[in-house]
Structures are given as C-alpha cells and as structure tokens.
Amino acid sequence: MEDGNSQGNRQGGGRGRGGRRGGGSGQSREMQISKALSRLLRHQAENAGIKLDEAGFAPLDKVLAYGPLKSLKVTVEDVQEAVASSDKQRFSLKPNPETNPSLSTTSTSAADYLIRANQGHSIKLESSATLTPITLAEPDTVPARVLHGSYFAFWPAIIEAGGLKKMNRNHVHCSTGTPEEGVVSGMRKDAELVIEIDIVKSLQEGLTWWKSENGVILTEGDENGVVSSRYFREVRGRAQDVGVLWQDGQRVADLPDGITIRVPFGKNAHGGRGGNHGRGRGGGRGRGS
C-alpha cells in the first residue's frame, strides 16, 4: 500500500467483520470487498465507465460507486484495510494529488484517493507505465528463479499449446519462489506443478519481462502470447512426487498413471469445481496456467 497505514479495527452496524454475507456464498464481507475490487480494477472498469490512468489507477470515489461495492456500503476505511491486509498485496492506494494536494493519508473522503490492482488485468494497460522492466542490461533486475505454478489437469493443454499461454490476461504470471518458501504472490498455494523458466534464455531471444509492485514476475510471451516450452528449465510436482516431466527445454516423462486429476476451483472454464478424475489426458480445456 503506497499510503502507509491501515486504520485498524472497525465498529458498528451490520457491516462488521464477518458480518454481512451475500448471495448464500458464505464469504465474509472483507472477502466480498476484495473480490469486487479485483473484478472491477482488473477486468470491468471500462464496462463500468471508470477510466484508469496510464498507471492503472482509478478514482476511489468512482470505484465505490460500482454496484457490488455500493451495495456493500464500502467506506474508505474498508478499502484501506483491504489494501493493508491483502496477503498477496493485490492493490495499491495513494492520495490523489488533484483533489488532495497535501497528500494526506488520513482523509476519509474517497475523492482524495486513487486505487489500482497491482497485476492480473485483462484491461489493456501500458506495461511500462505500471511495471518495472526486467532486462539483461540491468542484471540486478533478473530474478535467480522464475517459476510458474500449474495443475496436472492443465499439463496436457500446456504441452499441446507448446508452452504457457496468457489466455485472457495481459501477461503470464510467475513467481520467484514457492508458497512454502514464503513467496505469497505469483503462484497459487494449491498449484500441483512447478514450471521453472529459463528467463535469461527467453530474454536473449526477445521476450519481455516485468516485475509488479507486489513482486509478481510477468511476461506477454511471444507474438502469440505464449512462453515456449523450450524455455522450461524443469517441470516437477510439488506435493505429489511425479518426477521430472521436462528438463532443459525437452520432454522427459509423462504424468504417471494413477494420480488424481482435478480442475481447481475458479479455473474451470465450463463452470463447476472440477470433476472426477482419472488421468485427465484431455483436461485443461486450453488453460495455460
């Protein structure tokens, strides 16, 4: 969070912590706020008539007028807490210099702030305005490791596509480590496969890489939006030992028989939580991540 401190605990009303739950979803109010902010700032701003600046920031007062947030009666304090408490540092909040020339971080007026999602957009933004470039000309910017987390269900589709596809997002998302190593952004905690990418080779061959404010490593891929499998330094399982599937740009093994294949929640393009499982050789349905 760019403006520093959150405001601490809230009191009162039916809007307290864990209070109102919508649509039978069982989600806490805080989770509903975070998801609504992500959905708007990453994907729906244009449809909602909200103009993002070149760095991806939107006026907070207009954001809070967005239907799902308005229905939750979200306050500046709620947003400050959502920004400060996000385990993956999904958002940045800063004073709006046009309406808040003193750059106060204690104002309770939404008009005095700008907010953005740090990455994950399908809305087209200029990467150079929102992200830090990773280049061979500045070796200190190049991470020692670049990892992409995926799932057994999607591995056949990754092979078929010839690599990782950015899909409907602007970038393929990667991390500099795994969740068990304390890296909280760039890889889902339930990822089943770790794909290590040779970032140096890919940079040498023309791929562009970036780092977001919350430490996610991003690339647009090649002209087709793909990070080629020839850049896969190694692919292996996380919790399940499935051996090494790919090494130094070459396929060395298939997924073993008998493993459980599941489509993770939120990743099934055709709805549902994923199914029963078998080997799932036809799985993935085009997902690249």
Question: Predicted regions span which residues?
Answer:
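Eukaryotic, polar/proline-rich low-complexity intrinsically disordered regions
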Residues: M1-S289
